[in-house]
Amino acid sequence: MKTIVIVDLQKDFYDPKGSLYVSGAETFPSRIAALVPEYDNVYFTLDWHPLNHCSFKQNGGIWPVHCLKYSWGASLPDEVLAAVDASRQHISYYHKGDRSYEEEYEAYRKITDNQLRLLKNSDEIAVCGLCGDYCVGLTIKRLIELGLKDRIVVLKDCTGSIDDGSTLEGIISENKLKTR
């Protein structure tokens, strides 16, 4: 069984009009949509912030307001959702950063037994999305902590970073992860 974890592929990150747009990320939805049929399970992780989130500059954090719950910026690309619907895979959503007082870059900090079982039953866990130097990289580290290192494949051409990509490359190299 193969699982793809699509990290924070939300309009505020991939759309040039988004508040935290990552250069070049507008090409990711079509690339990821083309890959979706290869996988049995699709996990979307979502930044899912309240307006008073601690990470926002107006509240003492470092980021502009982004990915507000139920907003345009928090939404997923239609073409990826259509690909999932057409392929009829098992789909799951993981909301993070949804408590105003807590920053949460990585997915699976609050993993359920069912989520962990699904991941452990996967022969391959492909990881892609935004941003490699924050949420993608820390999600990979969390998957490693959960004992899933040998199953991880980083989809580099579907992953963008705020930095020059060196943080994610360091995580890949340090952990000898597979890439595609």
Labelled PLM ranges:
Residues 2-5, 10-14, 24-41, 50, ...:
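Active-site-adjacent betaalpha module
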